[in-house]
Amino acid sequence: DENTCSMSHLGIALAGQVNAVSNLNAYVASGMFPGTHIHPITNGVHHETWTSPALANLFDEHLSGWRSDPTTLAHAGRLPDEPLEMARKDARAVLRDLVRAATGVELEEHRLTIGFARRFATYKRANLVFSDLERLRALGAGKIQFVFAGKAHPKDEGGKQLIRDIFEGASQVEQDIPVAFLEDYSMDTGLAMTSGVDIWLNNPIRPMEASGTSGMKAAMNGVPNCSI
């Protein structure tokens, strides 16, 4: 169409080098733009920014130099168990306090807390856990709780519907499974969540997730990813 312009093709034509944010992203993009050499440079996160104060203090004590050389964190398996658990406990308490103040939801200290905070794009499937409420209750009643956060683009109706789905699902299971949604997402909220949950939920439609960095932030705080 002579009246339209593809910004992707224009950018590729004018660029000296075309990069992707992961190996998978480069593979998928190469299929979308045949004949274009696409160089993968995997995304990352700034390690100091996304480490909770409690964990940072522990790293300072046992992993000297981690701030200037993050490869030092490869030795995190040597951290003593009890101080590590205390640091994780502090981070969990920060998140519980934030959720209580912002939403009124009382997270329970001894439940497994599952977190999900991202841009609400449809391919990220933020509402997937509510697709089978009976199964969710059977597996999680009295055992788990959820914290969600994020924003949808104002013109993304699908993304906004995901948020409505989460609120609807939360209302259906709230007697058995607490669900909190932290509004006005910010970096402070992101740090509290990625350091204060027990499991980080990741369930995008493959291969539409180009890289995904929130799980890297969680990993900085000893939080494992559950990828579906």
Go through each PLM region and give its residues.
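Catalytic cores of carbohydrate-active enzymes across secretory and cytosolic contexts
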Residues: D1-I228
